[in-house]
Amino acid sequence: MSIRYQTDVLIVGAGLAGLVTALELLDSEHRILILDRDEPARLGGLAKESFGGVTMIGTPHQKRTGIRDSPELALADWIRTAEFEAGDAWPRRWADYYLNHSLQDVYHWLSQRSVKFFPVVHWVERG
């Protein structure tokens, strides 16, 4: 028995990027189909392993609690923990871009979708 689906867009992978893409397309009233290799209980991919933590710079939560951060400070931390090699130009560019755009592209995007934040400082290094 074969199953047929009709969709405007097929998204392969239900990790963070796939789910964000799906939300954006649903906002535009597209019909979507998401295919993922995992079972439904593991929906979210590697994002689930981050304990829900997201790196963002300059959020109202940080300012309210007196946490001083900047893209420059965060980039120095990122470079130190990532252990980039000499030829890692694109990963460095990505880190710089992300840190300079995390407030608008991540924090405000999530806030517009009524995502609530539990303001706890986490370190990726778990240190």
Sequence positions of predicted segments:
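N-terminal Rossmann-like FAD-binding beta1-loop-alpha1 element of flavoenzymes
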Residues: 7-34
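A short, basic/flexible loop-to-alpha-helix module at the beginning of a structural domain
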Residues: 1-6
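Conserved N-terminal/central alpha/beta ligand/cofactor-binding core
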Residues: 37-127
